Amino acid sequence: MQPLNGRSWSPIYESRPNSGGTYLVDEFYVPALERSVRYDRIAGYFSSTALAVASQGIDALLEHGGEMRLVVGTDLYKSDKPVLERLGDELRDSLEELDDEQLDAHLQLLARLLRENRLHIKVAVPREGSWQIFHPKMGIFHDDDDNALSFEGSVNETIGGWKRNYERFKVHRSWEDGEDAYVDADVDTFEQLWSNEHPFVEVYDLPEAIERELIDWKDPDSESEIKEAIQIARGEAPATELDKANIIADGPLTPGGLAL
């Protein structure tokens, strides 16, 4: 496995047009996962569609014996509910009973990570009553040489965040003087949250959050996002907007194309 400090990372990443929406995934998310043994993530929103988008990197993380720890807000997606609701102690065995063939591809990946104890999810709620939601967005990649790469910006752990929106975030490297203090602060914040020792935020294990009815099960932003995630998880490349435009433009040149 290549270490995190063996690659050149930009100080800032932002979405780029005409990349098919894959720039952040291809240039940052997957390469970072491929070099990591742990991925710690704080996000306002999480969806298993994000796992599908980065499935290549997730596979590499698993090959390294790695794991993911997520601290997320209370807004989770209805499409993930059939799997996430089985996390309670009395229901955890039912994860083994899920028929993967009856699950969409992105849910198969979610169920697999949970079964193998490679994905751990906690839910955060602000202690201050006037604060409506938990909304920070930060992540930390760790390799087996004790290097860490942290990022903070606008991107949520969803397909929309990594692929469909205009997003921008800054990156800090633990092995670079002047950047290590930012990484240390990010690690401290995450560990405070994970151990429920943050002064301003209450953190629950996901099964407890579900039992307390803290979760707001929201609809996906669009059905097309789910379909796109399924295609990616299956290894199928979804058509880009440019592809679609070319199909329409070339319509008259195709057999029967005058009907397009």
Question: Which residues fall in each region the model found?
Answer:
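PLD/PLD-like phosphodiesterase catalytic module centered on the HKD motif
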Residues: M1-L258
